[in-house]
């Protein structure tokens, strides 16, 4: 969103508490102001947090225009998240990630992750609502036109992914076609439904997570 809007980042107070957009109440007058009002309209905090925010990036910032990872030193990947992931999946260094925010009705089209300069595995962690995850053959060059993703029936595997599940795509699966055709409403675990309203904070956002799926998709950009 930073390409099209001036983001109203919350200010730090005198404590060491991390700041969050959840600091603003849903009915806040604070707006995301468009850089070009002729193209985009102002957005409220509620509009952004409930529907308009679809993804953020961590670590290496992918250049979506040129389909490459920039050569300069990337922002540091969050150490606590990297430590957890590299303990579970030691063969992949957590260098870049896309955090997707899904609401029931959202989908992710079939695609392949081929921009990384390494064949290290992809890590996908899910939180919140269940989703259907589809994975299909990666050798599209040997498939008939009718069998290619998006063209009728084809060989594929369909998995139901629940909160806390992890998928590690490596070896033959590393470059496979994959996507999310459906997010299942009302399937968020009870213990997550009230997040981020915990410990007396962000109470006005209670229930935000109830119809959300958050997917952390992590990859190593290049061999070290």
From Swiss-Prot:
Gene3D superfamilies: Alpha-ketoglutarate-dependent dioxygenase AlkB-like. One of its GO terms (molecular function) is metal ion binding. Residues 93-222 form the Fe2OG dioxygenase domain. It holds the Pfam family 2OG-FeII_Oxy_2. InterPro entries: Alkb, AlkB-like, AlkB-like_sf, Oxoglu/Fe-dep_dioxygenase_dom. 2-oxoglutarate binds at residue 213. Disruption phenotype: Leads to a 1.95-fold increase of the m(6)A RNA methylation level, a slower growth rate and a significantly reduced sporulation. Also significantly reduces virulence on chestnut stems and red Fuji apples. Results in the up-regulation of genes primarily associated with amino acid biosynthesis, 2-oxocarboxylic acid metabolism, and ABC transporters, as well as alpha-amino acid metabolism, small-molecule biosynthesis, and the sulfite reductase complex (NADPH). Its EC number is 1.14.11.53. Binds 1 Fe(2+) ion per subunit. It is an enzyme of class 1 (oxidoreductase). Belongs to the alkB family. This is N6-methyladenosine RNA demethylase ALKBH.
């Amino acid at each position: 969103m930073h390409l099209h809007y001036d983001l109203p980042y919350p200010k730090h107070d005198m404590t060491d508490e991390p700041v969050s957009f959840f600091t603003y109440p849903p009915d806040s007058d604070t707006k995301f102001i468009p850089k070009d009002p002729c193209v985009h309209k102002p957005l409220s905090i509620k509009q952004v947090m409930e529907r308009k925010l679809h993804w953020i990036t961590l670590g290496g910032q992918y250049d979506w225009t040129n389909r490459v990872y920039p050569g300069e030193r990337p922002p540091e990947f969050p150490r606590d998240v990297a430590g957890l992931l590299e303990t579970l999946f030691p063969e992949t260094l957590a260098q870049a990630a896309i955090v997707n925010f899904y609401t029931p009705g959202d989908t992710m089209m079939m695609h392949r992750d081929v921009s990384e300069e390494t064949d290290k595995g992809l890590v996908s962690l899910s939180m919140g609502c269940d989703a259907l995850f589809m994975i299909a053959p990666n050798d599209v060059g040997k498939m008939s036109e009718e069998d290619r993703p998006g063209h009728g029936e084809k060989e594929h595997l369909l998995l139901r992914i629940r909160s806390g599940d992890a998928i590690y795509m490596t070896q033959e699966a590393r470059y496979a076609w994959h996507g999310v055709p459906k997010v299942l409403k009302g399937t968020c675990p009870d213990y997550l439904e009230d997040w981020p309203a915990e410990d007396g904070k962000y109470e006005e956002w209670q229930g935000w997570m109830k119809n959300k799926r958050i997917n952390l998709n992590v990859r190593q950009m290049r061999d070290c």
